[in-house]
Amino acid sequence: MDLDKLLQHINIGEDHEIEFKSADGGLPNNIWETVSAFANTDGGYIILGVSESKSGLIISGVNKPNGLLKNFWNNHNNSRKLSTSICSNSDVQVLEVEAKNLVIITVPRAKRTQRPVYINNNPMTGTFKRNFEGDYCCSPEEVRQMLRDAANEPQDIQILEGFNSFAEFPILYVLSIAHK
């Protein structure tokens, strides 16, 4: 994320692809819900070091970015905290804005086979999705759907043996189904 886009979002506020979090006390405990939500939806940005005030969002900064990053990576790579290590080194950066450090975490959308991305070792209570500016806990049915989608190989990527041309397709397809 470039500086101009970041400053514009600070003026506009949060939405479906950006979440601001204060990091005054270190890594926020609720960051993992947001990582899960972005990974299970369309991806997004988590900006650490931006606080809410009565007048809107303000850049408060991150005091010790290296310690915060160490804590982030230790938890990110712990399967008891986060089911899938979704971010890579290039997804995390420290940016100086107004003489203060911000940590920008780009959370990519998880592949279908990686979902659900969940926290605390429990897919039924630890799977989140993003809806406008909030993270919400997925229902058991949503989680089961993600698990089904992850396990099933779509029919359109399977190679059907014995088909030499599309002209043969209808007859051979019907015959292959009849023999199953």
Segment roles from a protein language model:
Residues 1-180:
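Conserved N-terminal catalytic/coupling substructures associated with nucleotide/phosphate chemistry
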